[in-house]
Amino acid sequence: MVCRTCHCTITECCRSTRRDPSPTEPVVRLSRRKYGEHMKTACVIGAGAAGLAAGKALADRDIDFDWFEKGSYVGGLWQIDNDNGGAAAYHSLHLNSSRPRTQYPSYPMPEDWADYPPYYQVAQYFEDFADHFGLRERITFNTAVEKVEPVGDHWEVTTSDGQTREYSNVLVANGHHSSPKIPHFAGEFTGESFHAHDYRDLSVFAGKRVLVIGVGNSGMDIACDAARNAEAVYLSTRHGVHVIPKYALGKPVDQLSSPLMAYVPFPVERLAYEAIVRVATGRPQDRGLPKPDHKLLGAHPTVSAELYDRVGHGDVVMKPDIERFEGDKVEFVDGTTEAVDIVVYATGYNVSLPFLEGVYTPEHNKMPLYLRVVPPDLPGLYFMGFIQTVGSGIPLTEYQAEWVGDLITGEVPMPSRDEMRRWIDADQKAMAKRYVRSERHTMQVDYWRYIKTMKEARGKGGLLSKIPGLR
């Protein structure tokens, strides 16, 4: 038996008190523990990347909690055709962040995996994580949370089985990629259309004329997929973007960064990235894409190892924004017109929290949260994983979860409301100066700086105190 935490081959892991259960050995539930004079109870909503991190953090502290997952699986959007309705994986999907930058700090991915594993290995990684830490039997599957509301000094949570339960703390980890955003255009398109959320396989494009709207990661992936068997592929964008390669200088590009970036002034960091990307790929406007109207890292970059070649080969034709649809014709703002059979909207998502209606409703995807987790005026409510970063958010969710676990047990204090509001105000001003104004950039955090911030919030002495792990 090999432990993923340290790869030792003994039954009892030398770096962890946990071990893999045998197929016939049930995992023993952790005992309940009282903190102070009453039981501290919690509820976790969702069993995707952020939910799994949250559940592990609570279980590690012997906190008594319930855990609800709408579907039948752990892993959230990485489970293709997940029956919770939140799946966004497709058959060609691979990680856009490298394996070491994507894994949870407490549970490394196997070293013999590829630099950028496919979706099904990532899904298996979450399954293995849940089993390794004895989390699966804690989850109530196929049970949706329908309502969460504050009542006095606690929270009432109503689930799809008709029960209402009380908790001191609610950890919301349902993700922010479940409610597709589809823009409105003048006219009417009479062909087939769907959101990238519903895309699974390139067979749908065979022999068709395809228009993909949006140049985020999914948009570029889908356009490149379509180029393999479609009659024609057009990729429409309102503005230029910086395209980040997966490799530069012989390494996965995100491995060229280091924890030291948390201590480097942002302009210096930007110059370093610009030099690397320009050497690796050149400028977007020199590779057939529109010139970006912002500097590198001034917006969420798009990662693609294939698009530039597809454009250079003529397999994907870049187009500007759409003016209007008319039947099977699409007119672009530059006056050109193309006939298409399929339109794919790779146009992002709206944050959806229907169970918090009337309690907490994000406007234009804005969520003013202390450390991107805590709403100052709603004590006991935590939002896990509602972040975006240049890199993977998965490891960041574990840093969030460990901090929240410390808050619940009282190991670290919760700042005052005024302190939290001041932090939020400063953070929002900093992000407004750095990023273009759009609904996509309301959750941005800097990968290394955010880890440093979360470790300091736990009193762990900053990022460089112990980079690989959490404790």
Language-model region placement:
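C-terminal structured "cap/appendage" subdomains that terminate the fold
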Residues: I424-A430
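Basic, ligand-binding patches in group-transfer machinery
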Residues: S258
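Short hydrophobic transmembrane-like helices used for membrane targeting/insertion
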Residues: M1-V2, I10, V27-V28
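Flavin (primarily FAD) cofactor-binding/catalytic cores of flavoenzymes
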Residues: C6, C14, Y35, M39-S92, ...
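Flexible "cap/lid" subdomain of the alpha/beta-hydrolase fold that forms the substrate-access gate
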Residues: H94-S97
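Short, Lys/Arg-enriched N-terminal segments with co-localized hydrophobic residues
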Residues: P26-H38
